[in-house]
Amino acid sequence: MKALTVNEKEYSIIKLLGKGKGGYSYLAEKDGKQYVLKQIHHEPCAYYNFGNKIEAENHDYKRLLNAGIRIPEMIEIDIENERILKEYIDGDTIFDMLKNDVSVEPYMEQICEMAEIAKKAGLNIDYFPTNFVVQNGLIYYIDYECNEYMEEWSFENWGIKYWSKTPEFIEYISKKD
């Protein structure tokens, strides 16, 4: 894959950044500027039901923005081709930092504040550490997924299990490699 279009504008694809439950995210470039281009996929996910994924992404983006969660800007959405163009947040993920034995302690206060903002807005975000990038000392939630708040999926009850080298984190890495 060399290029993808978003609303008839062509973007060069540099590399695959990652695959999530809802799509593939690519590092893309146009006119010397880098972006994230997300292509929605329709592969089955045993533990999650999406409905219309592109509409859900747009809806969730607005909910996160209104709540005050630090997220990359959605620059364009192409409903027909199920593609989203996002601001590229350049930096390491919390996941990669943990995997490489870099302390994430400096970011714990920020994630706890973000979790409190989400809770006050009645939302849970996906606290898995691949969804957070550090840029200039700030953490960004780079996914747009959010759900109605449920205590069992809060940062304190679920997310924290993956923000250090806990048995859950180590088990995830061993299954992934």
Regions found by a protein language model. Give the residues of each.
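A short, low-complexity linker immediately N-terminal to eukaryotic Hanks-type protein kinase catalytic domains
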Residues: 1-13
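ATP-binding glycine-rich loop module of kinase domains
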Residues: 10-55
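Protein kinase-like catalytic core scaffold
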Residues: 35, 70, 84, 140-143
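The N-lobe alphaC helix and its flanking beta3-alphaC-beta4 segment of protein kinase-like domains
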Residues: 49-67
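Conserved structural core of kinase catalytic domains
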Residues: 50, 69-108
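Amphipathic alpha-helical segments that line or abut small-molecule/effector binding pockets
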Residues: 104-120
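C-lobe/activation-segment region of protein kinase-like
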Residues: 119-124, 135-177
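Hydrophobic residue at the +6 position relative to the catalytic HRD Asp in the kinase catalytic loop
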Residues: 127-132
